Amino acid sequence: MKIAVCVSGGGTNLQAIIDAIDNGTITNTQIEVVISNNADAYALERAKKAGIKAVCISPKSYESRAAFNEDFLKQLNSYHVDLVVLAGFLVVIPPEMIKQYRNRIINIHPSLIPSFCGTGYYGLKVHEGVLARGVKVTGATCHFVDEGTDTGPIILQNSGLVIILTLLNVYLFSGDSHRCSQPRQCALMLLHGIRIAV
């Protein structure tokens, strides 16, 4: 299976996916390209170190969002991937891309959907919401991407009791953090052979 990984930041989840492929936890999978909207994202360096094509496609480089959306989809299509993994990608996915890649784009959201999800809940903002509400159980949700925000069909969820919560990490009773959960969820999905409906 050929995958593209889209990421906006440091790429700790990307690195965990790379490592899982390298050590055989994830099999029959190859990362064709890593795409970031941020030229300074360390994820691009991680990809290069692993011998993976690294590309920056930033909305700021285009005259309009429509022009960005068109080029983003064109470049993604050029890699002929089977699956797109959003690993902390802070860009709204273009509707045409969702249509072309229906049930082939997955996102791992750092909460148990339907809690702390939707517009405004991303990255540390999710953890701020968890902290403010004082919840005792949190986790991560792997879901297909649709036209809504965190509304696609849920594939897997991983939960645990919150024992320490800071704005940098959510440590769960199971010993996992969001950074650990994402590649594990991807690995489980790929290893359990979830079929992609095209």
Please provide the spans of the model-predicted regions.
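One-carbon transfer enzymes
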Residues: 1-198
